[in-house]
Amino acid sequence: DSESKPKDEL
Amino acid sequence: MNLFRFLGDLSHLLAIILLLLKIWKSRSCAGISGKSQVLFAVVFTARYLDLFTNYISLYNTCMKVVYIACSFTTVWLIYSKFKATYDGNHDTFRVEFLVVPTAILAFLVNHDFTPLEILWTFSIYLESVAILPQLFMVSKTGEAETITSHYLFALGVYRTLYLFNWIWRYHFEGFFDLIAIVAGLVQTVLYCDFFYLYITKVLKGKKLSLPA
């Protein structure tokens, strides 16, 4: 999905 | 983490360190847009505030700290230590044309209307256009030093590899983040013209210069 998740990308 | 993502991060790191070393070794920041570097420092600061709220991994934390530290060091070198060599007369892009629209867009189009999420979104939008002052400077002076070209190439490759990472993640994890993908596409497209010049000129041993 396109929802807010913990941001693991930089 | 897939290979595209990892190589993308390495390419980003390479670009940042290449620029730092170029300025440090030559004791000069001629040809470098201080405005783009300030924008990148703003991008990292706005995006990595989650260092204080969210622990993801040692890799994630280290990379974020290194990106921020290098970015602020670069800004300091340009505006303080080697200020005399800074080419301000050619660095005339109006950054408010980038900051204001991306800030408004971040308020309007985001995943969640919270301060951290809006700042993250702002950083994604701003990053996609933050290189414009630098590209504008290259087009204005009509040339770029070879090492500056390598820097721009590595920086462009980073977001391009992230695009492949997102295709991979969508395919294998069903994960996608539309805000990052669209902004990443815009960012990559902005580099396309430069990629062409880099491959046709710089890789053949010529200095990057634009036709008058």
From Swiss-Prot, chain B:
Organism field: Homo sapiens
What Pfam families is this protein classified in?
Answer: ER_lumen_recept
User: What role does this protein play?
Assistant: Receptor for the C-terminal sequence motif K-D-E-L that is present on endoplasmic reticulum resident proteins and that mediates their recycling from the Golgi back to the endoplasmic reticulum.
> In the record, what terms sit under GO molecular function?
ER retention sequence binding; KDEL sequence binding
A Gene Ontology cellular-component term:
Golgi membrane
Question: What the record says about its domains?
Answer: Binds the C-terminal sequence motif K-D-E-L in a hydrophilic cavity between the transmembrane domains. This triggers a conformation change that exposes a Lys-rich patch on the cytosolic surface of the protein. This patch mediates recycling from the Golgi to the endoplasmic reticulum, probably via COPI vesicles.
Q: What is the effect of changing D193N?
A: Loss of recycling together with cargo proteins containing the sequence motif K-D-E-L from the Golgi to the endoplasmic reticulum
Q: Which domain of life is it from?
A: Eukaryota
Biological process terms from the Gene Ontology for this record are:
protein retention in ER lumen; protein transport; retrograde vesicle-mediated transport, Golgi to endoplasmic reticulum; T cell apoptotic process; T cell differentiation
Stretches of the chain found on the membrane's Lumenal side:
1-4, 53-58, 111-116, 169-178
**Segments on the Cytoplasmic side according to the record's topology features:** 25-32, 80-92, 136-149, 200-212
Q: What is the effect of changing Y158F?
A: Loss of recycling together with cargo proteins containing the sequence motif K-D-E-L from the Golgi to the endoplasmic reticulum
Sequence similarity: Belongs to the ERD2 family.
Tell me what this protein is called.
ER lumen protein-retaining receptor 1
Subunit field text: Upon ligand binding the receptor oligomerizes and interacts with components of the transport machinery such as ARFGAP1 and ARF1.
Modification after translation is described as:
Phosphorylation by PKA at Ser-209 is required for endoplasmic reticulum retention function.
This protein's UniProt keywords: Cytoplasmic vesicle, Endoplasmic reticulum, ER-Golgi transport, Golgi apparatus, Membrane, Phosphoprotein, Protein transport, Receptor, Transmembrane, Transmembrane helix, Transport
Residues bearing Phosphoserine? S209
Membrane topology note: Multi-pass membrane protein
The site annotation (Interaction with the K-D-E-L motif on target proteins) covers R5, E117
Q: What InterPro entries does the record tag this protein with?
A: ER_ret_rcpt
Q: Where is this region: Interaction with the K-D-E-L motif on target proteins?
A: 47-48, 159-169
- Gene responsible for this protein: KDELR1
Q: Where is this site: Important for recycling of cargo proteins with the sequence motif K-D-E-L from the Golgi to the endoplasmic reticulum?
A: D193
